[in-house]
Amino acid sequence: VVRFSNAISLENYSGDMEFGTNLSLANRTPDKKGLLPYNAEIHKSYYAYTVTVDLDLVGVDENDNIDLQKDNIEECKDRIIKLLEGIEFLHRDIKADSKNMNPIFAIGGIYNIKNPFFANRLELSEYKKLNVSLINEILNSINSKNMGTTYIGCLLEKFSNGEEIKSELKSESIVNFFNKLREEVNNYYASN
């Protein structure tokens, strides 16, 4: 029902190495003495990933004969709203290392064809410059066939061509993007 693609870096690897020790763990392990050194790769980059949701299958489990689409449509809607909130404020915590993974560019909508239109289609043509012409090409294809409405949210300051993104793609804030998607989800389930 919900699929996340792998996150792919949009930039070449340019990283660093973090070295640390774990004295607390070493002190709790009787046969290990020392600081138990470790290292971790540090890579800062813009990443792209795709999330696809088949709204017709939310709450449906044929193996257990569950169909919330018929029994509790509100639960289906609430699940997708919570998913959107999770993506909007995404972060990760691993070994006391917290990373902000909130989207800085988001594009999508509800389409009448189940296809991840933007998967592997975002690229940076130069340093922090989003390839707007490639996105426009995809949008023209979607719009020419009346497949649905596409929304775009962007933190313009994070891209060197923020003004081009705003004027060419008619982007809005990330908050407005997610608000419009939530509204689309509400409308979708209200009509079913």
Spans of features found by a protein language model:
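Basic polyanion-binding and macromolecular-assembly surfaces
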Residues: 1-192
